[in-house]
């Protein structure tokens, strides 16, 4: 009789531990996952496409930029401004060098 009670008690304790023990481990894993969700990940923001692409001047934009910089383009140079600014990246100094070098002497 004592052996039967001992076996039942042992089985009950073992089964209870198995059920609740796995539940506690499972809850702990979820707590860790939830804490990871709360902690913000610090990373550098990804730049948008417009800021990654090199600024090139082609066509109408090139003409407007040239007119704003030099007025008329008086060139004696054999350099092609559209090749410099549309294929490569150019700046104000390139436009001054090709279109109006005499107007902006240093």
UniProtKB/Swiss-Prot annotation:
Protein name: Probable insulin-like peptide beta-type 2
Keyword set includes Repressor: no
Signal peptide: 1-15
InterPro entries in the record: Insulin-like_regulatory (IPR052335), Insulin-like_sf (IPR036438), Insulin_CS (IPR022353), Nem_insulin-like_b-type (IPR003235)
Source organism superkingdom: Eukaryota
Origin species: Caenorhabditis elegans
Similarity field: Belongs to the insulin family.
Secreted found in the keyword field: yes
GO terms under cellular component: extracellular region
Molecular-function GO terms, alphabetical: hormone activity
Gene3D superfamilies named among the record's database cross-references: Insulin-like
Propeptide residue span(s): 16-56
Key words, A-Z: Cleavage on pair of basic residues, Disulfide bond, Secreted, Signal
Location relative to the cell: Secreted
Covalent S-S links between cysteines: 58-86, 70-99, 73-100, 85-90
UniProt cross-references to PANTHER family, sorted A to Z: INSULIN RELATED-RELATED-RELATED, INSULIN-LIKE PEPTIDE BETA-TYPE 2-RELATED
Xref: PROSITE patterns: INSULIN
Primary localization class, coarse: secreted
Any single GO BP term: negative regulation of dauer entry
């Amino acid at each position: 009789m004592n052996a039967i009670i001992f076996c039942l008690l042992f089985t009950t304790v073992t089964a209870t531990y198995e059920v609740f023990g796995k539940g506690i481990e499972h809850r702990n894993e979820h707590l860790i996952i939830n804490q990871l969700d709360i902690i913000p990940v610090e990373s550098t923001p990804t730049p948008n496409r417009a800021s990654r692409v090199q600024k090139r001047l082609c066509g109408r934009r090139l003409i407007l930029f040239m007119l704003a910089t030099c007025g008329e383009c008086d060139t004696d140079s054999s350099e092609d401004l559209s090749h410099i600014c549309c294929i490569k990246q150019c700046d104000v100094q390139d436009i001054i060098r090709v279109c109006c070098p005499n107007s902006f002497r240093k």
